């Protein structure tokens, strides 16, 4: 269940459910529409959570290729999930759990296990009712303790994979009070060559949805510009909804502006009225405005960051991008992320690194592109360029230091080179006997102890931090003494595991790496300390002396 320091949950309201479906094509932005709705409801004083339904047969997203699917987002309990849950955590400022991600693989696995154990007492196990009942159970359990639960159904209406979920939603609406259920459908409204907004794709999508037994209460048109009134009226007429239930969600440069745009259209007020909770909302002058203040502030400069990785898909590093953006919001600067392909570290990419104010090497798996990452780290270290290494970036910083400072030319990670004579990065002891790939790494939130009077202690404002992990390998203890004697300080650790490295301020203005993924806990209103410190170093402030009040998590 999502947890926060304080909750506004009012059991007298009962639970409200908002289901968000999509039509015409995938990738329309259902998740951002749903998250923006949740953000506005939270601003109005309601306790909000979310559920993402992914109709694939994978149990989780842990074994999916980031190049095809985008990043694997890690939750505090170790759940490896779709990147949309990252958007929900960032927009709603909550911590979610693996129970908030429903996949076909997880649902079928659970039902089959129950059948094998005899729980169904010899009955024929079918999609209806057994699979649909399990889907409904998962939604209700995830919603416990919240006023509103927003459920996003992945994929597009009409996809065969999604049919059991839409049937479960139809049953769900039949079982709950009418005032407790709201269906939002997000569709594409394209322009014709003559500049006319076309409604036919939306009409057909709603027709498909209605054929399943679902009637949308709200329609959100994804478009390059706002829907004009004629378009809204036409959609309302043919889709059988009031004109005031048709909303625009036009393209924007920054997704954090979407809540403000749909608020201007009155989406939040309409939702509250339909769910019969408008009278329970905070007065407008008492609602949370920090989000608006942050995303509409006038910036006072810009910073260029080189992100050195091997995946061409921007979504593969979404949380890193967002964490850099959050740090920019805190320091009141625009952050321009320059992509540097670590597989093609030629003169062109070297020039891009030289032009950058800082270098970030993110996480990843596999040998492809690692030599380019090592070269980028060497360049940052030798030229006093502020540097942040994350997970694999942390490990490659150890490899780079071993090679170029300790003169261990063949040093490497045992994950990437099984025959290396100097495995400065080696497999975690508990991983030796594990054969399965999915869900078997060191995952989720773990506490790291931090040495006093270090850069890490200054950034985190104390002698410990709790961040999320996703790795099988760690620094080889046999090399720690030699590395530290040569100037590489391991300032954060969990028992005998090294989890933060840094260089002393007299050796480098800002050089830090983390075995964990601080980007997964970064929020627009609470930026991640290592990312804030990176910008501090670029802007000329000494992150080694920044106070806790200036950089807080």
From Swiss-Prot:
<dbReference type="GO" id="GO:0004359">
    <property type="term" value="F:glutaminase activity"/>
</dbReference>
<dbReference type="Pfam" id="PF06418">
    <property type="entry name" value="CTP_synth_N"/>
</dbReference>
<feature type="binding site">
    <location>
        <position position="84"/>
    </location>
    <ligand>
        <name>ATP</name>
    </ligand>
</feature>
<feature type="binding site">
    <location>
        <begin position="159"/>
        <end position="161"/>
    </location>
    <ligand>
        <name>CTP</name>
    </ligand>
</feature>
<comment type="subunit">
    <text>Homotetramer.</text>
</comment>
<feature type="binding site">
    <location>
        <position position="252"/>
    </location>
    <ligand>
        <name>ATP</name>
    </ligand>
</feature>
<keyword id="KW-0665">Pyrimidine biosynthesis</keyword>
<dbReference type="InterPro" id="IPR029062">
    <property type="entry name" value="Class_I_gatase-like"/>
</dbReference>
<dbReference type="GO" id="GO:0019856">
    <property type="term" value="P:pyrimidine nucleobase biosynthetic process"/>
</dbReference>
<feature type="binding site">
    <location>
        <begin position="198"/>
        <end position="203"/>
    </location>
    <ligand>
        <name>CTP</name>
    </ligand>
</feature>
<feature type="binding site">
    <location>
        <begin position="27"/>
        <end position="32"/>
    </location>
    <ligand>
        <name>ATP</name>
    </ligand>
</feature>
<feature type="binding site">
    <location>
        <position position="234"/>
    </location>
    <ligand>
        <name>UTP</name>
    </ligand>
</feature>
<dbReference type="GO" id="GO:0042802">
    <property type="term" value="F:identical protein binding"/>
</dbReference>
<keyword id="KW-0315">Glutamine amidotransferase</keyword>
<comment type="pathway">
    <text>Pyrimidine metabolism; CTP biosynthesis via de novo pathway; CTP from UDP: step 2/2.</text>
</comment>
<feature type="binding site">
    <location>
        <position position="26"/>
    </location>
    <ligand>
        <name>UTP</name>
    </ligand>
</feature>
<dbReference type="InterPro" id="IPR004468">
    <property type="entry name" value="CTP_synthase"/>
</dbReference>
<dbReference type="InterPro" id="IPR017456">
    <property type="entry name" value="CTP_synthase_N"/>
</dbReference>
<feature type="binding site">
    <location>
        <position position="415"/>
    </location>
    <ligand>
        <name>L-glutamine</name>
    </ligand>
</feature>
<dbReference type="GO" id="GO:0097268">
    <property type="term" value="C:cytoophidium"/>
</dbReference>
<dbReference type="GO" id="GO:0044210">
    <property type="term" value="P:'de novo' CTP biosynthetic process"/>
</dbReference>
<dbReference type="Pfam" id="PF00117">
    <property type="entry name" value="GATase"/>
</dbReference>
<dbReference type="GO" id="GO:0005524">
    <property type="term" value="F:ATP binding"/>
</dbReference>
<comment type="function">
    <text>Catalyzes the ATP-dependent amination of UTP to CTP with either L-glutamine or ammonia as the source of nitrogen. Regulates intracellular CTP levels through interactions with the four ribonucleotide triphosphates.</text>
</comment>
<keyword id="KW-0963">Cytoplasm</keyword>
<dbReference type="InterPro" id="IPR017926">
    <property type="entry name" value="GATASE"/>
</dbReference>
<dbReference type="GO" id="GO:0005737">
    <property type="term" value="C:cytoplasm"/>
</dbReference>
<feature type="binding site">
    <location>
        <begin position="392"/>
        <end position="395"/>
    </location>
    <ligand>
        <name>L-glutamine</name>
    </ligand>
</feature>
<feature type="binding site">
    <location>
        <position position="152"/>
    </location>
    <ligand>
        <name>Mg(2+)</name>
    </ligand>
</feature>
<feature type="active site">
    <location>
        <position position="517"/>
    </location>
</feature>
<feature type="domain" description="Glutamine amidotransferase type-1">
    <location>
        <begin position="307"/>
        <end position="544"/>
    </location>
</feature>
<comment type="similarity">
    <text>Belongs to the CTP synthase family.</text>
</comment>
<feature type="binding site">
    <location>
        <position position="26"/>
    </location>
    <ligand>
        <name>CTP</name>
    </ligand>
</feature>
<feature type="binding site">
    <location>
        <begin position="198"/>
        <end position="203"/>
    </location>
    <ligand>
        <name>UTP</name>
    </ligand>
</feature>
<dbReference type="GO" id="GO:0046872">
    <property type="term" value="F:metal ion binding"/>
</dbReference>
<keyword id="KW-0436">Ligase</keyword>
<keyword id="KW-0460">Magnesium</keyword>
<feature type="binding site">
    <location>
        <position position="234"/>
    </location>
    <ligand>
        <name>CTP</name>
    </ligand>
</feature>
<feature type="region of interest" description="Amidoligase domain">
    <location>
        <begin position="1"/>
        <end position="277"/>
    </location>
</feature>
<feature type="binding site">
    <location>
        <position position="472"/>
    </location>
    <ligand>
        <name>L-glutamine</name>
    </ligand>
</feature>
<protein>
    <recommendedName>
        <fullName>CTP synthase</fullName>
        <ecNumber>6.3.4.2</ecNumber>
    </recommendedName>
</protein>
<dbReference type="InterPro" id="IPR027417">
    <property type="entry name" value="P-loop_NTPase"/>
</dbReference>
